[in-house]
Every structure is written in structure tokens, then in C-alpha cells.
């Protein structure tokens, strides 16, 4: 997979390649993750014509897993760069709000980095972090650097 864009915040990770949303994973079912999840489910409804009720938050530990496993196994990514762009902006706004109000953000970043290292070992993690470092144009400055610092301090 050629990763060209990644968005991360303490509750959720989104990977986008060539404008197609490929995968999202909620790490924690906190309020921020729920907000981002709603945006993702809305996009899914729009693209696949699926009922939003299909993705009820109480149905699984990670409400997005069931939906995204369907995409991964079908081999058909969501093909809507417009929706993906809107999701990026909303997730980054939620991230900025969360970090400005949370003293625990660095600890959460460190745990997310550990998760990423296990899931995407080797040079892939560097690629993900480097994409995070290029988010200043949309308001989430130096996310990659914050992740590295948090991991070093852990």
C-alpha cells in the first residue's frame, strides 16, 4: 500500500491512499473517537447507501471494525476523495480541541505510537509519522514530532 495521507488523534487513526479511505481504527471509545466515528459512518452511508443504524456504537468493542473489515475483505476502498477530505478536517479539528483540553494527550500519543509500531513494523511507521508531520496546512501542527517526543519520554 502506498500511504499518501494519515490522520491521527488519541481516539482514531485514518489511513488514506490516493484519495481513497482505506482503513480506520478506533483505539479508545472516548468522546473524540466517537465524533470521528460518526463522520466516518456518515461517509460510509453516503458512499455505500448503508443505513447509519447499521453501525450502532453499542454493538461492538470497536464499532468501526465490522464495517472496515468488509471493505478490506472486499478489496474495494471507499472512492470519495471529497468525503475523505471533509473527514480529515473534522478529525483534525477534534484533535486540536482534545489536545488543548487534555493533559494526558502526550501519554495517549505514546500509546498510539506503540500500537502503530506493532501494527506497521519497520519503515512503514516512519512513513506514517512523516505524513503526520506535514499537517500544518490544516491546523494540526507537528503531530509526528509530538508522537516521537511522547515515545521518548515514556
From Swiss-Prot:
One of its GO terms (cellular component) is host cell cytoplasm. Residues 50-92 are annotated as: Leucine heptad repeat region. Residues 93-103 are annotated as: Single repeat region. The ATR13 effector protein is a highly polymorphic member of the RXLR class, yet only a small subset of the polymorphic residues appear to be involved in RPP13Nd-mediated recognition. Polymorphic residues of ATR13 appear as clusters across the surface of the protein. ATR13-Emco5 is recognized by RPP13-Nd because it has the critical residues Phe-73, as well as Thr-119 and Arg-148 within the highly variable C-terminus domain. Keywords: Host cytoplasm, Secreted, Signal, Virulence. Residues 104-154 are annotated as: Highly variable C-terminus domain. This is Avirulence protein ATR13. Has the canonical translocation motif RxLR, but lacks the canonical EER motif, which characterizes most oomycete effectors identified so far. The leucine heptad repeat region contains five protein variants with 12 amino acid polymorphisms. Leucine heptad repeats are a feature of coiled coils where the leucines are embedded in an alpha helical region. Three of the different variants were recognized by RPP13-Nd, suggesting that alteration of the amino acid sequence in this region is tolerated. It is found in: Secreted; Host cytoplasm. Its main location: secreted. Belongs to the RxLR effector family. Secreted effector that acts as an elicitor of hypersensitive response (HR) specifically on plants carrying defense protein RPP13. Recognition of ATR13 by RPP13 initiates defense responses that are effective against oomycete, bacterial and viral pathogens. The allele ATR13-Emco5 recognizes RPP13-Nd, the RPP13 defense protein from Arabidopsis thaliana ecotype Niederzenz. It comes from the Eukaryota. Residues 1-19 form the signal peptide. A motif (RxLR) lies at residues 38-41. Pfam families: ATR13.
Amino acid at each position: 500500500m502506498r500511504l499518501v495521507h494519515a490522520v491521527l488523534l488519541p481516539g482514531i487513526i485514518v489511513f488514506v491512499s490516493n484519495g481513497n479511505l482505506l482503513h480506520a481504527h478506533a483505539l479508545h471509545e472516548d468522546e473524540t473517537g466517537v465524533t470521528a466515528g460518526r463522520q466516518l459512518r456518515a461517509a460510509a452511508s453516503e458512499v455505500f447507501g448503508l443505513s447509519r443504524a447499521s453501525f450502532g456504537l453499542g454493538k461492538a468493542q470497536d464499532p468501526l471494525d465490522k464495517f472496515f473489515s468488509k471493505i478490506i475483505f472486499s478489496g474495494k476502498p471507499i472512492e470519495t476523495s471529497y468525503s475523505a477530505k471533509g473527514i480529515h478536517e473534522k478529525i483534525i479539528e477534534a484533535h486540536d480541541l482534545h489536545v488543548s483540553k487534555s493533559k494526558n494527550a502526550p501519554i495517549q500519543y505514546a500509546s498510539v505510537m506503540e500500537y502503530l509500531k506493532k501494527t506497521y513494523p519497520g519503515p512503514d511507521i516512519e512513513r506514517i509519522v512523516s505524513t503526520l508531520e506535514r499537517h500544518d496546512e490544516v491546523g494540526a501542527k507537528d503531530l509526528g514530532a509530538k508522537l516521537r517526543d511522547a515515545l521518548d519520554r515514556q
